[in-house]
Amino acid sequence: MRHGTHTGSNPYAEAYVEVTAGGLAETDLAADPIEQFRRWLADAIRYNLPEPTAMVVATADADGRPSSRHVLLKSVDDGFVFFTNYRSRKGRDLSENPSASLCFPWFAIGRQVVVLGTVTKVTREETEEYFASRPRDSQCGAWSSENQSSVVPSRAWLDERYAEVAQRFAGVEHIPPPPFWGGFRVIPETVEFWQARPARMHDRLRYRRTADGERPWIIERLSP
């Protein structure tokens, strides 16, 4: 159930909406965080949350300056996979500092998942397979934005670039991925599952990777 909990003149306080839901106990969790994530993602999809695979990807450059943006999760295996322009700010950050944090904000059902991990590029074969599944206009868009995150003169300039790319590939049945475009895989070191509870006494359970082959993950409860 969702309900407002603050009154007064502070607009930020007025905007706060509390979500009450069932608790989250250690015994509720799968032994592996990837399996637990799949369960919660299935719940987010079942509840028809908008863009349930949208996540905030936070990176930092070599000097520690952070940046963040929303990106769509494309697959989950031993890590969390997304695709982007390698020349974008996040691509440059990850080439200098291959660590990232992900946040899945499923606040409508009182949940969020926060991942911290190291980042590697996916294979070119994985990139080609995913790129082939994209709509043709999105493929052209990837080629059009050769220097993502750079300053451009105008919207008209962007539209002209797209038209040029679409014309270039007009007779090509299968558009290949650009050499500056591909995927990253975030290999988790910690994964926190956050469940909203009344009075801000939220449940926070974190998986932490260990060097123990027989017990690769430890589950810890964090103070709310």
UniProtKB/Swiss-Prot annotation:
Q: Cross-referenced HAMAP family, in alphabetical order?
A: PdxH
What is said about its interaction partners and assembly? Answer: Homodimer.
Q: Which cofactor does it need?
A: FMN
Pathway entry: Cofactor metabolism; pyridoxal 5'-phosphate salvage; pyridoxal 5'-phosphate from pyridoxamine 5'-phosphate: step 1/1; Cofactor metabolism; pyridoxal 5'-phosphate salvage; pyridoxal 5'-phosphate from pyridoxine 5'-phosphate: step 1/1
Q: Write down what this protein is called.
A: Pyridoxine/pyridoxamine 5'-phosphate oxidase
Which catalysed reactions does the entry list for this protein? pyridoxamine 5'-phosphate + O2 + H2O = pyridoxal 5'-phosphate + H2O2 + NH4(+); pyridoxine 5'-phosphate + O2 = pyridoxal 5'-phosphate + H2O2
Q: Name one GO molecular function term.
A: pyridoxamine phosphate oxidase activity
- Source taxon at top rank: Bacteria
Keyword check for DNA damage, yes or no.
no
GO biological process annotations for this chain's record? pyridoxine biosynthetic process
Q: Which annotated residues bind FMN?
A: 69-74, 83-84, 89-90, 112, 148-149, 194, 204
Q: Where does substrate bind?
A: K74, Y130, R134, S138, R200, M201, H202
State the EC number(s): 1.4.3.5
The family assignment reads: Belongs to the pyridoxamine 5'-phosphate oxidase family.
The beginning of the lineage is:
Bacteria, Bacillati, Actinomycetota, Actinomycetes, Acidothermales
| Cofactor: binding details | Binds 1 FMN per subunit.
Q: Which UniProt keywords apply?
A: Flavoprotein, FMN, Oxidoreductase, Pyridoxine biosynthesis
Role played: Catalyzes the oxidation of either pyridoxine 5'-phosphate (PNP) or pyridoxamine 5'-phosphate (PMP) into pyridoxal 5'-phosphate (PLP).
